[in-house]
């Protein structure tokens, strides 16, 4: 059944003369009145390298949409660079910005009655924020990301932002060497080149089905990234007419992002050792979609999904550009499908089922198309470059080696255990998360005395000041969604542990979270958090912490009676919290619920 255009409320009828006059002043031509209005939700900013190159692409998408008969209007959201906001109180604002982005998209699209959206996202909180908005609005939506940064290179070795952070804190590394690394770590526009949060989310968007193949892996500088934007423009027009003209609801976000799609996305995440932040975001997006997807599902999947792809920071051998050469996300999904670990019947924005998309785009498929070969041969140029789609370097050959290549088959998996795991115990009754792909197997079982800090800043000072020694478990409390507030990322503490050459000799646990750039025995999202009365807030220096990844447990060596009788450790830090952050803290839920706001 044909659907009424949402935009008709502001473009049709005598009483909308004023609104039509305003649309005309926005550039709408008379022949465009009554045609679908498609919002281009951009996120250009000169604060974030993952977004610095998006200033003109929105207008290219607009032109492509209007060639096909619709009207398009662009607006921007905010975007925070977690790397620049890291290590100081700026990180308090990162996670809350996800909800601000979701709200701002909802406000703009509903206020102006747009009929559909193209979401141009890229970095850490922008993609999940826009996805949350898409689920709320449930209008035809296509996502296309700005693409990953090329990996840096020094002395024939790849490097990235995390190398700069670790080496700068290592006193054995000279200032000259640090300067060389700093100048080569981030050579192009795009989101940071490892399987950090931004790239993880852009890859998961392919698995959910709201982005086209190549979205997560084609580098930002390549001409095929520009083609992806053109393809997204064509797709949103097609889907808009499918819904409003033909009444086809299969193109709507909630029809695509079903429970099965979230299970597929999480299976991919576990198989590629993605950022632990993805757990937080997928739970929040599923909450907005009203899809039945919970922490227990993640625990279940983590026990049966192997690790098929390892990328920085879990190894320095591969970066996202190498995943692209190996066939991208469809290459990993193809292996998961062969093992029966994903549901290939789910639908996608391109009208195909996941199974059909894998058949067409998996480079090991006998039916792989030429378009796929071209996408996945898109290479890094190896030059400093801040311009989107400005180079056309191609690999001569694809990486189809599923035994020893970047992407493995089930028989040659990096590990039978997946790249993420959910642990539970008397420290984390509602669960916590560890990226096992980044943990050396020699410390999957770890027991040690607690060194407790009530802030990230105190932990950094303690680590750099020599208070943390081999065998310790660093415990950072009161950094959860409510307690921070804002659930800061603990990338600096984990980087400083590595800089002190303790990466395989210490653990770190927190009710805060971690950057996708974190590796090592780093356990976050401990729920309930200290600010909600969680037992992590009762741990004292010297308490023995027991971590067992194979058994999925984390405990402090105290009886239930001892824990119940012990008071919360008082918070000694001084931290100024603004009214906006206090408002966030008053509404936010725990990490095991996705840190969504609880609003009646």
Swiss-Prot record:
Mg(2+) binds at residues 82, 124-125, 489. Pfam families: ILV_EDD_C, ILVD_EDD_N. GO terms for biological process: isoleucine biosynthetic process; L-valine biosynthetic process. One of its GO terms (cellular component) is cytosol. It catalyses: (2R)-2,3-dihydroxy-3-methylbutanoate = 3-methyl-2-oxobutanoate + H2O; (2R,3R)-2,3-dihydroxy-3-methylpentanoate = (S)-3-methyl-2-oxopentanoate + H2O. The keyword Repeat does not apply. [2Fe-2S] cluster binds at residues 123, 192. Keywords: 2Fe-2S, Amino-acid biosynthesis, Branched-chain amino acid biosynthesis, Iron, Iron-sulfur, Lyase, Magnesium, Metal-binding. Pathway: Amino-acid biosynthesis; L-isoleucine biosynthesis; L-isoleucine from 2-oxobutanoate: step 3/4; Amino-acid biosynthesis; L-valine biosynthesis; L-valine from pyruvate: step 3/4. The modification N6-carboxylysine is found at residue 125. InterPro entries: Dihydro-acid_dehy_C, DihydroxyA_deHydtase, DiOHA_6PGluconate_deHydtase_CS, ILV_EDD_C, ILV_EDD_N, IlvD/EDD_N. Its cofactor is [2Fe-2S] cluster; Mg(2+). The keyword Amino-acid biosynthesis applies. Binds 1 [2Fe-2S] cluster per subunit. This cluster acts as a Lewis acid cofactor. Functions in the biosynthesis of branched-chain amino acids. Catalyzes the dehydration of (2R,3R)-2,3-dihydroxy-3-methylpentanoate (2,3-dihydroxy-3-methylvalerate) into 2-oxo-3-methylpentanoate (2-oxo-3-methylvalerate) and of (2R)-2,3-dihydroxy-3-methylbutanoate (2,3-dihydroxyisovalerate) into 2-oxo-3-methylbutanoate (2-oxoisovalerate), the penultimate precursor to L-isoleucine and L-valine, respectively. Homodimer. This is Dihydroxy-acid dehydratase. It comes from Bacteroides fragilis (strain YCH46). The lineage of its organism: Bacteria, Pseudomonadati, Bacteroidota, Bacteroidia, Bacteroidales.
